[in-house]
Amino acid sequence: MNIAVIGLSHKTAPVDVREKLSVPEDVRERALQHLCGYAHIQEATILSTCNRLEIYIVTSDTEVGVREVHQFLSEWSHIPLPQLRPYLFILLHQDAVMHLMRVASGLDSLVIGEGQILSQVKRCHQLGQQYKSIGPILNRVFTGAIAAGKRVRTETSIGTGAVSISSAAVELADLRLQNLQNCRIAVVGAGKMSRLVVQHLIARGVKEIRIINRSLERAQELAQQFPEVRFELFTMTDLLPIVAAMDLVFTSTAATEPLLDRDNLGAVLVGDRSLAIIDISVPRNVHANVTELGTVQLFNVDDLQAVVAQNQEARRQLAQEAEGILEEELETFLAWWHALETVPIIRSLRQKMEAIRTQELEKALSRLGSEFADKHQGVIEAMTRTIINKILHDPTVQLQSQRDLESRQRAMQTLQDLFNLEPIEA
């Protein structure tokens, strides 16, 4: 079995491409069923965040399995494969495993060391288990990556004071508007990202915030976490008039279609007062055409790069320390994986050796006579087992220690050919 990851991220694709490949949780089961319906995909799970869409698979045939994922991505996004392919990356075997470890540790994030990605990797693993799309191999890949992510955060300082997407959004707002305390501010959405935006606004002295959310109850739960701030809470029916009255709006909802566009926003804006909108959602909550309204400034997650870059250099140095931890965790995984892959051929070889040992032992004992056999059978039995174990020890260790996939598979094929083995299922 082969491990692969196929996907795209903030490093390979702009937000207008990433949003078309987003796989929200409410459709995750359908997407996983679709993936696992392909003939060459035995296990699969999907990591979908605002900055990445990655599909992890276990496949019996790497080339065909990757091709099946490409087909899925093209169908899901409605983007022809020739247009989509330049944005995609493919990593195989241990490179795919190391990539997930780096992702879970925050080393591959837009914001190096950010902590939210570890929770997202855990959730990806949970959903794969819940929908029964992952088996023993991906289960071990993800438990190893999660363990690696925890170690990096525990044993290094990479997460200390890390900029997050939410804090970068507030930083960008502060750079653009300067005095946030005197701005009329609204946050659209009441999830984790919105909570972090509120938290960072409060840290900059903001005392009044409007929350707009589909569920008023969720908005109330968010507001109750920050009793020191005066909140006004609204449902989505009030979205347009509230936004039109603001100086600054943050949007972070799970909506799959834009909530704001040139037409609906233009209909409610009055006068020439400026409005800044920072959209940290993927798919985007705000259509790019709002910038055609002369008084509106729009920023999305890709516009946060400059803000994030300010504290990245120090974090890159800490990331080198984290890479050593990941190498240790990768070694642990590879030892397990290599042993797992070689189990069928080793078991088949041992079964053949045991059959020969048993057959020859019976012949020898029958020639020695019943009196000798009864007296010494236990000793001879133990001796022959020890001989078999010692003969097989070195080939077993050498086979399991082969790190290179092709070399290991050649060695397994050689054993099968030399001993005329019939491989059994793992």
Swiss-Prot record:
Task of the protein: Catalyzes the NADPH-dependent reduction of glutamyl-tRNA(Glu) to glutamate 1-semialdehyde (GSA).
Q: Which GO terms describe its biological process?
A: chlorophyll biosynthetic process; protoporphyrinogen IX biosynthetic process
Q: Which UniProt keywords apply?
A: Chlorophyll biosynthesis, NADP, Oxidoreductase, Porphyrin biosynthesis
**Miscellaneous notes:** During catalysis, the active site Cys acts as a nucleophile attacking the alpha-carbonyl group of tRNA-bound glutamate with the formation of a thioester intermediate between enzyme and glutamate, and the concomitant release of tRNA(Glu). The thioester intermediate is finally reduced by direct hydride transfer from NADPH, to form the product GSA.
Q: How does it assemble?
A: Homodimer.
Task: Please name the source species.
Answer: Thermosynechococcus vestitus (strain NIES-2133 / IAM M-273 / BP-1)
UniProt key word Protein transport? no
Q: Which NCBIfam families match?
A: hemA, PRK00045.1-3
The positions annotated for binding substrate are T49, C50, N51, R52, S109, E114, G115, Q116, Q120
Residues given in the record as NADP(+) binding sites: G189, A190, G191, K192, M193, S194
Query: Active site located where?
Result: C50
Name used for this protein in its record: Glutamyl-tRNA reductase
Which Gene Ontology terms cover its molecular function? glutamyl-tRNA reductase activity; NADP binding
Cite the SUPFAM superfamilies for this sequence: Glutamyl tRNA-reductase catalytic, N-terminal domain, Glutamyl tRNA-reductase dimerization domain, NAD(P)-binding Rossmann-fold domains
Q: Where is this site: Important for activity?
A: H99
Q: Which gene encodes it?
A: hemA
Q: What pathway is this protein a component of?
A: Porphyrin-containing compound metabolism; protoporphyrin-IX biosynthesis; 5-aminolevulinate from L-glutamyl-tRNA(Glu): step 1/2; Porphyrin-containing compound metabolism; chlorophyll biosynthesis
Which family is this protein grouped under? Belongs to the glutamyl-tRNA reductase family.
What is catalyzed by this enzyme? Answer: (S)-4-amino-5-oxopentanoate + tRNA(Glu) + NADP(+) = L-glutamyl-tRNA(Glu) + NADPH + H(+)
Q: Which domain of life is it from?
A: Bacteria
Question: What EC numbers are recorded for this enzyme?
Answer: 1.2.1.70
Q: What is known of its domains?
A: Possesses an unusual extended V-shaped dimeric structure with each monomer consisting of three distinct domains arranged along a curved 'spinal' alpha-helix. The N-terminal catalytic domain specifically recognizes the glutamate moiety of the substrate. The second domain is the NADPH-binding domain, and the third C-terminal domain is responsible for dimerization.
